[in-house]
Amino acid sequence: GKALRDGAISMAESTWYKYARKLGYSEARKPEKKTRKKGSFNASRPNETWHMDISQYKTLDNVIFYTYTVVDNFSRKIIAWDISTKKCSKIRTDTVKRAIKNEFDITIGNQSLDLIVDGGTENNNKTIHDFIKNCEVTINKKIALKDVTFSNSIVEGPYKIMKSYYFRSKEILSTTIYEELKFFIEDYNNNRPCHKHKIYTP
């Protein structure tokens, strides 16, 4: 390129690039291929793998809320949830406790599962660590795209549906968001067909 512009080489531009390709010079200009993030993971049974995350939502009256969910990988069901104006480890831990009670109850002993989280401090802190350490259920907490190759998109999916299809056309206020969220979760779990299960709900 520069040699042609400076007149140091006398040949057609197309000829120059043809020889440059043969000699491998053009390869250096190609950008490196980025490593593609791998997709999610499909569990083979219910309560084999759970995903948890927190999503932020600002209401029409400018109040920020945090929605906490735990989603079962196999069924795609939201098995525990909460909502608060606070982002804290206690609420996060309480949702895991609730998920365990909802799913195992009297069969709580001799159970084990993988818990997939993102790398944020809301999912990785002493409160969560201490609970997992002393829990009757064996919980293997793993960070998505770090401890495992797949993402945490399973738990992010319901949030996207909630915001795009349930909340977008409504005037969500701080006084109504709890009931709106409750309706969404009940509808998502019991009425809305899940893509993975085709015509069936989680």
Label the model's feature ranges.
Residues 117-119, 125-132, 141-164, 175-182, ...:
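RNase H-like two-metal-ion nuclease catalytic core shared by retroviral integrases
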Residues 72-73:
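Short, acidic, Ser/Thr-enriched surface-loop or helix-capping motifs
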Residues 179-202:
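Charged, gly/pro-enriched flexible loop segments at helix/strand junctions
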Residues 47-58, 69:
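Two-metal-ion RNase H-like nuclease active-site motif
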Residues 63, 81-107:
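Active-site beta-loop-alpha junctions of metal-dependent nucleic acid enzymes
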Residues 1-49, 129, 202:
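Basic, flexible linker segments flanking DNA-binding modules
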Residues 60-66:
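Short, flexible loop/turn motifs enriched in small residues
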Residues 77-78:
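Hydrophobic "anchor" residues
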